């Protein structure tokens, strides 16, 4: 992995009681060694693999102003990180779910792009056995479960300040979104809506097929081609590029897919990240609720699975063998 650490600082937030969140600040940057490089490579890998939301700084963002000063050399990176940790403590203390953790600031390069990653990492307890087979307790950073993380694409931010996607962050699931306080700390707002872009793509594909008056099987085959390309991009960690997608798809009528989507006003970006859950709708129907969970290939609709809209009834002809076996055993036990 070609990851080069430029500067890295660690500080700590310690929760003393329900009302007190103390700050412990380092007096120097963390020296870069093999252990630090391994930790950052793992954090970068874990973060890159997770689904992220996109954002941008508000005009009055204190963090953005401080970061600009640091980038210009008016303030050193350590001072920037110490002041930012203090602001993070003040923001985090407002919330009942506030917990302590190790606060990490790392400026690094990956594939010719400069990033600033900010994270609050939890410290976990575990057990270890030494060479003498003695047992002792140990602490480790729970990087795999890190959910308070934001990353700023410094290259994008400085070369394209009007971008709505140079800042990415994870969304938490504890009470009020954990990400909310982090966004307040960053003084940032959500930018590019990845799910909306993917939903717009699906709608454009359906409308393009309808405009060409494709039959059911032809339409589903077209959706499958779209899904294959998008899924390949997702697996490779790359974005969906409309121009490339249009080149891979058969042209329907006088306009290719990119021309059609541009003229119809779907407001799709030239490229955007793939959303796994949304893209799955190209090839499958899925839903759950009221104790029922259903998932089936789109090709089965009107073949083995029929939906009556008037009565909201789904009829399935031919059940999966394992389900049929369970039903038969339950019926036989009555």
From Swiss-Prot:
InterPro entries: Nucleoid_associated_NdpA
Pfam families given in the database record: NA37 (PF04245)
A single cellular component GO annotation: cytoplasm
Record-level Gene Ontology MF annotations: double-stranded DNA binding; single-stranded RNA binding
Keyword Aminoacyl-tRNA synthetase among record annotations: no
Subcellular compartments: Cytoplasm, Nucleoid
Keywords in alphabetical order: Cytoplasm
HAMAP family, sorted: NdpA
Protein family membership: Belongs to the YejK family.
UniProt xrefs under PANTHER family: NUCLEOID-ASSOCIATED PROTEIN YEJK, PTHR38772
NCBIfam families xrefs: PRK00378.1 (NF001557)
Name used for this protein in its record: Nucleoid-associated protein YPO1262/y2922/YP_0879
């Amino acid at each position: 992995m070609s990851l080069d650490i430029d500067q890295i600082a660690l500080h700590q937030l310690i929760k003393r009681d329900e009302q007190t969140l103390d700050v412990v600040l380092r007096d120097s940057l963390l020296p870069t060694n093999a252990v630090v490089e391994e930790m950052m490579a793992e954090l970068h890998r874990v973060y890159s693999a997770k689904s992220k939301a996109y954002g941008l700084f508000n005009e009055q963002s204190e963090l953005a102003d401080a970061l600009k000063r640091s980038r210009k050399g008016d303030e050193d990176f350590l001072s920037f990180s110490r002041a930012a940790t203090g602001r993070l403590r003040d923001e985090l203390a407002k919330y009942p779910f506030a917990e302590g953790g190790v606060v990490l600031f790392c400026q690094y390069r990956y594939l010719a792009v400069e990033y600033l990653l900010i994270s609050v990492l939890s410290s976990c307890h575990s057990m270890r056995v030494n060479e003498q087979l003695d047992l002792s307790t140990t602490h480790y950073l729970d990087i795999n479960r890190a959910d308070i993380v934001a990353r700023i694409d410094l290259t994008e931010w400085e070369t394209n300040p009007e971008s709505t996607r140079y800042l990415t962050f994870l969304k938490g699931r504890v009470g009020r979104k954990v990400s909310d306080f982090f966004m307040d700390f960053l003084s940032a707002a959500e930018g590019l809506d990845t799910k909306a872009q993917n939903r717009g793509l699906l709608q454009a594909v359906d409308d393009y097929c309808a405009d060409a008056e494709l039959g059911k099987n032809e339409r589903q085959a077209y959706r499958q081609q779209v899904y294959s390309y998008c899924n390949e991009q997702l697996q490779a960690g790359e974005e969906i590029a409309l121009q490339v997608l249009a080149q891979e798809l058969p042209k329907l009528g006088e306009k290719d897919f990119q021309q059609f989507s541009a003229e119809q006003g779907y407001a799709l970006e030239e490229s955007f990240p793939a959303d796994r859950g949304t893209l799955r709708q190209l090839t499958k129907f899925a839903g759950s609720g009221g104790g029922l969970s259903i998932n089936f290939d789109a090709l089965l609709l009107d073949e083995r699975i029929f939906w009556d809209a008037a009565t909201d009834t789904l009829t399935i002809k031919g059940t999966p063998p394992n389900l049929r076996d369970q039903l038969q055993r339950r019926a036989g036990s009555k």
